[in-house]
Amino acid sequence: MRTCNRRKILDAIIAIVERDGITAVTFDAVAAETGLTRGGLLYHFPSREALILAAHQHLADQWEAGMEKIAGGKADTVEPAERDAAYIQSCAQMARRVELLMMLESAGEPDLDSLWQGVLDRWSPPVPDDDDPA
C-alpha cells in the first residue's frame, strides 16, 4: 500500500472515532472520509478488524514516539526518571478522546490490548510490591 494512502486511511479512522465513536468505523465511512473506494480499502485491509488493529497500532506508535521525543530517546536508553517524566507528560498532553476510546475498546481484546500494554510496559513506572519493605 502506498504510504500516503495508508496514512490517509488511518487518519480517517481516527477522525471517525474522535467524531462518532468506534462503532462508526465501517468500510463505507472510511471510504467516504478518504475518498478511496470501498474495494480499495478491502484490498489492503481485508476486514473491519484489520482496520481497527491498524488504527490501534498507529495510535500506540504515536504515543510512544511522543514519549521518545520528550525523553530524548527510546525507553531502554534513558534514565528511569526521564522515562517516568516522559510518560507523565505525554499522558497529560496526548490524552485525546480518540486515544481514550481506543484504549477502553482494547480492554477486552487481547490482540489490541497487547499493543497498548507493550508501550506501557516500556514506559510506565513499575508499581511497587506491597510486600516490599522499601
Task: Place the predicted regions along the sequence by residue.
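Helix-turn-helix
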Residues: K8, I16-A50, A54
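Alpha-helical DNA-contacting segments of helix-turn-helix folds
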Residues: I52-L59, G66
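Amphipathic alpha-helical packing segments from all-alpha helical-bundle domains
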Residues: E64, L104-P133
